[in-house]
Amino acid sequence: MKALFLVIFAYLLGSITFGEVIAKLKGVDLRNVGSGNVGATNVTRALGKKYGVLVFFLDFLKGFIPALIAVKSFGIDSWVLTFTGLASVLGHMYPVFFGFKGGKGVATALGVVFAVSPSVALFSFLVWLGIFLWKRYVSLASITATISAFLFLFVAGYPVNVLFMAIVIGALIIYRHRENINRLLTGREHRF
């Protein structure tokens, strides 16, 4: 029963779209600004770096807190961790409180990975930073870091439930970036 409550908690916490909440408090409708996304990147474009960093941190915590509880309560090799991590990211992408229209899940996924392995999260962030500084595309950096996280977890020998979680979350993140991928391939993606 505790496991079920944790998964539900993870989804509901993930469903709090902090970008949208903060933007509304500032009188901005993110759906009508920039990319229309509710994540940290669009918040940065619409409200500035201070609010973008705040949203990134809050979205990160949405993944980190439930995943850390799962790791501490059930162990890293427990499928409870897998479903908790997935629920956090799915909540962010498809939030019940905001008409199932959320963000792309990158910061929330990073929080999940950090709860599993701070070193893998750090390496993935460094990959993101390197690609971003080189190409100035947030989407390309996010996709590359997502793939890198799975590879780092695989090489480090993490259990199958963690690898499964990383594959599913990675596939969801790439799917949520499908329009960005199309724009990257056609040279129409916006640089940051």
UniProtKB/Swiss-Prot annotation:
Gene Ontology molecular function terms on file: acyl-phosphate glycerol-3-phosphate acyltransferase activity
Cell location: Cell inner membrane
EC number: 2.3.1.275
Keywords tagged on the record: Cell inner membrane, Cell membrane, Lipid biosynthesis, Lipid metabolism, Membrane, Phospholipid biosynthesis, Phospholipid metabolism, Transferase, Transmembrane, Transmembrane helix
Segments passing through the bilayer: 3-23, 51-71, 80-100, 112-132, 149-169
Domain of life: Bacteria
Catalytic activity: an acyl phosphate + sn-glycerol 3-phosphate = a 1-acyl-sn-glycero-3-phosphate + phosphate
Pfam families per UniProt: G3P_acyltransf
Membrane-topology descriptor: Multi-pass membrane protein
Keyword Lipid biosynthesis found: yes
GO CC annotations, alphabetized: plasma membrane
Functional note: Catalyzes the transfer of an acyl group from acyl-phosphate (acyl-PO(4)) to glycerol-3-phosphate (G3P) to form lysophosphatidic acid (LPA). This enzyme utilizes acyl-phosphate as fatty acyl donor, but not acyl-CoA or acyl-ACP.
Protein name per UniProt: Glycerol-3-phosphate acyltransferase
Encoding gene (name): plsY
